[in-house]
């Protein structure tokens, strides 16, 4: 630190004399200018930063060396199946550094609530504490079975994963929306709007629900059966205009939640039975994503983006379905407007996240896993399997927005890029100039 000390006393003639005389140098308490302070501070900070970078570089070299020799051996007990699915967490690449918090969980680890007619389980901030904006629920209904009439405090975005279902949702003005949906279709139920879901033939349905509250719990929704059970019979009779002995028979159980029932009539018959077009909702709450053309298609895969621009009722939740071919890369990017919650539909891949202060983490993902990326954190995803991998990118936002690193580099003057990356103009020209989203393997 001799250079730093010299810099600290360089502008002070008296201090120079003291230093040359060999006496102990003590900081002055008078006449110390702001310029002196800033000069000394910036030099010290630069030295500290250099020390930090050197230490990090040394850590990378140590990791590379350790992973090639006996240092990485583990003679103790291991959960071999788990390690097999997470090689990049067990032996991370040398570029990983520091801690960014949990970025992975799996629905296959979540407690499953099973009832006659189906089941449900969830991934929220209780098990993935970094995800404070969104919660995911995976639910199954057999043919005819209901997720009972209910409502809740969060918006509900959903994607059908399997089978067929009939959904209903009522607007506050009394208009009603009813529709049948199949695999790949979406729906959105606004917070506080009463709705229901019923499995259809031949084998019911399974779907992913995403709520715009990180601490949401599917066990805490407002249930029709509980409302009836805890309202006095006299009040129910007066409210519904029923005979006094009827309210006692209204609810089979205090909490239905999921329960079996007869299959419904046709969609046309259901719509006609409630008043047809006279009471039809002016808003469309389902979206046939399976019928839409890809928003972006490259040699490496495709992306379908659904947000408030093409599905207007999705004011708080935006989504992108990404399919990567083997070896393809979801390009290095970040999202300026929201953190990212992922659901892996098929295949397997690797995600790397790079944060500030040199923190970085790499994790492997498989079908039914949930991923998380902090807001504005740079990240990439690569297909590491021999088949296509597909995943959802979900955001608590009205629009899908991302910043492409390639796009940014090519919009800068070449001299600025060379100064940062130490490459010449011919190499810069090889970097894709437009946002690719997906780069082929």
PLM features: residue spans?
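Histidine-centered metal-chelating micro-motifs
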Residues: 145-148, 166, 185-187, 191-196, ...
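N-terminal secretory signal peptides
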Residues: 1-32, 58-59
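Ligand-binding loop in jelly-roll beta-barrel domains
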Residues: 191-218, 367, 375-401
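Mobile, glycine-rich extracellular loop/lid and propeptide segments
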Residues: 148, 157-160, 166-169, 178, ...
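N-terminal export signals
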Residues: 28-30, 36-57
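Glycine- and acidic-residue-biased ligand/ion/polar-headgroup-sensing regions
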Residues: 152-172, 335-356
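Short acidic-glycine-tyrosine-enriched beta hairpin
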Residues: 172-190, 356-374
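A short, N-terminal "cap"/entry segment at the start of jelly-roll beta-barrel domains
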Residues: 59-135, 235-325, 331, 422-441
């Amino acid at each position: 630190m001799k250079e730093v000390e010299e810099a600290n006393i360089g502008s002070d003639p008296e201090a120079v004399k003291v230093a040359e005389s060999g006496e102990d140098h003590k900081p002055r308490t008078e006449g110390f200018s702001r310029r002196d302070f800033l000069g000394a501070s910036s030099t010290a900070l630069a030295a500290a930063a250099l020390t930090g970078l050197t230490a990090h570089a040394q850590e990378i070299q140590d990791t590379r060396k350790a992973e090639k020799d006996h240092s990485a051996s583990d003679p103790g007990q291991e959960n071999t199946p788990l390690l097999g699915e997470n090689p990049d967490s067990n032996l991370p690449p040398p570029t990983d550094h520091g801690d960014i918090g949990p970025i992975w969980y799996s629905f296959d680890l979540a407690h499953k609530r099973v009832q006659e007619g189906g089941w449900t389980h969830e991934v929220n901030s209780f098990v993935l504490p970094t995800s404070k904006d969104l919660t995911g629920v995976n639910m199954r209904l057999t043919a005819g079975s209901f997720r009972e009439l209910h409502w809740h405090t969060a918006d509900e975005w959903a994607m059908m994963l399997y089978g067929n279902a009939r959904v209903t949702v009522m607007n506050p003005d009394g208009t009603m929306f009813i529709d049948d949906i199949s695999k790949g279709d979406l729906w959105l139920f606004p917070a506080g709007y009463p709705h229901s879901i019923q499995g259809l033939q031949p084998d019911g349905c399974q779907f992913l629900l995403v709520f715009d509250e990180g601490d949401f719990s599917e066990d805490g929704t407002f249930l029709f059966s509980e409302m009836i059970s805890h309202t006095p019979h006299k009040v129910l009779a007066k409210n519904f205009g029923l005979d006094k002995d009827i309210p006692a028979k209204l609810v089979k159980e205090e909490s239905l939640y999921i329960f079996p029932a007869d299959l419904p009539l046709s969609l046309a018959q259901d719509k006609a039975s409630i008043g047809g077009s006279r009471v039809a909702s002016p808003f469309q709450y389902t979206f046939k994503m399976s019928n839409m053309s890809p928003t972006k298609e490259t040699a490496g895969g495709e992306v379908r983006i659904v947000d408030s621009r093409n599905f207007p009722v999705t004011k708080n939740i935006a989504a992108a379905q990404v399919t990567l071919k083997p070896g393809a890369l979801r390009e290095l990017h970040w999202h300026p407007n929201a953190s990212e919650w992922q659901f892996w539909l098929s295949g397997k891949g690797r995600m790397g996240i790079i944060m500030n202060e040199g923190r970085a983490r790499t994790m492997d993902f498989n079908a039914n896993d949930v991923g998380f990326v902090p807001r504005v954190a740079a990240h990439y995803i690569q297909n590491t399997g021999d088949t296509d991998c597909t995943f959802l990118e979900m955001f608590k936002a009205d629009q899908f927005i991302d910043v492409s690193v390639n796009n940014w580099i090519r919009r800068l003057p070449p001299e600025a890029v060379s100064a940062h990356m130490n490459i010449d103009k011919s190499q810069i020209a090889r970097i894709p100039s437009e946002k690719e989203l997906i780069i082929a393997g």
